Amino acid sequence: MFSSIIKSCYGSNLLRDIVNHPFNVELMNGTLNIESFKFYIQQDALFLDGYIRTILTTVSRIEDHNDVIPLAKVAQGSIAVNKFLCDHYFTIYGVRRGKKSPACFNFTNFLLSISYSDTYEAITVLYSCMFIYKTVTDNMKSGFKENNKYKDWLDFYSGSLMEYGYATLENIVDKYCKKVGVNERSRMLELFRISAQFELDFWNSAYNFSRFNQFPKEH
């Protein structure tokens, strides 16, 4: 199954670079620059807009009607995550909605373009994003201290909404992996690798933001 193949990639250089990225390490340690975190929250909310649209486009095109309601619930969960970011962090830190960074713009454009491709491709990139986030948050759990100022972020991002989205997409992507041929499976792995690279670029952008002082302005 596709999820089993991906899970065997835990030690791959790209996934290791994501898990050990300074942004994620410092977030886990509670030492991350607050301006970098604010920039990340702003961009993550903008990213989720594109991710939600990708889910909804996929829902409208998916062949198996049994997957429609579960996928719609994943979209609903992602909307709840986005609302949490805006209601909680935007208020606490005075974050404005702003514009997409180049990394966020490229990532969401990639997702939306794939949503109009074959359905198995759309499901693959949606699952890849969930898988990578789960890998990162699972790795963080053992290192997070109760007094870490970012602990509510971890608690929410490793909570039931994300778990449901991950499990649902894993179930659907594995069904597609069984149905498609060898070439399509290779394409699924390629899409996972591309998604992981976009994720890495996203964290690079957040971590290096303060260095370049390029906080996108509000519309």
Please annotate each region the language model reported.
Residues 7, 66-164, 193, 197, ...:
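Active-site-proximal alpha-helical scaffolds that flank and shape metal-associated catalytic sites
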Residues 7-32, 51, 170-179:
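Short alpha-helical hairpin
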Residues 13-17, 31-61, 124-134, 203:
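Alpha-helical bundle segments that constitute or directly flank the non-heme di-iron/ferroxidase center
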Residues 39-50, 73, 77, 187-194, ...:
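A non-catalytic, amphipathic alpha-helix used as a structural packing/dimerization or gating element
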Residues 58-62, 114, 137-144, 176, ...:
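Secondary-structure edge/capping motif, primarily at the C-terminal ends of alpha-helices
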Residues 62-68, 181-182, 186:
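Structural helix-adjacent loops and short alpha-helical linkers that scaffold large soluble proteins
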Residues 164-193:
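Long amphipathic all-alpha helical oligomerization modules
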Residues 189-219:
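Acidic, carboxylate-rich catalytic segments that either coordinate divalent cations
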